[in-house]
Amino acid sequence: MGDYVVVLEAPIIVKDVETSEDAINVAVSKVTKALNKEKLDFVRVEIGYSQCPVCGAHFESAFVIGSVGLVGMYLTLKVYNAQSIEHAERIAKAVVGKALKKVPLKVFEIRELEHDGENGIEAEELNGEDV
């Protein structure tokens, strides 16, 4: 049995927005509200990033066309006692999918948590932050 950090990608559609900043704010609020309603406040919500195919620069994955926005988001959670990476993926999708019905979820990254054998402290870091 292993413990994993699972990062899921989710496309969130928002309506009645004018700018990409508005779309991001509404999407974060919408996702956070849905997760909190299901008592999933342990899921970390972050804005996704895309890469420009021409210059290679990274930018926030938020696009607005005709007052409708599409925001790419990363949802990060820990999965404990999974039998395999595939099992951790299924658990993460089931847990988050319960709150975000009709939102397609795709695995962006899965990493196994490392534990300090002495006291069980997790040594894995995610984007420079302790998880």
Swiss-Prot record:
Pfam families per UniProt: DUF555
InterPro entries: UPF0212 (IPR007564)
Similarity comment: family membership: Belongs to the UPF0212 family.
NCBIfam families associated with the record: PRK03922.1
Family annotation (HAMAP family): UPF0212
Name listed for the protein in its UniProt record: UPF0212 protein TK1194
Native organism: Thermococcus kodakarensis (strain ATCC BAA-918 / JCM 12380 / KOD1)
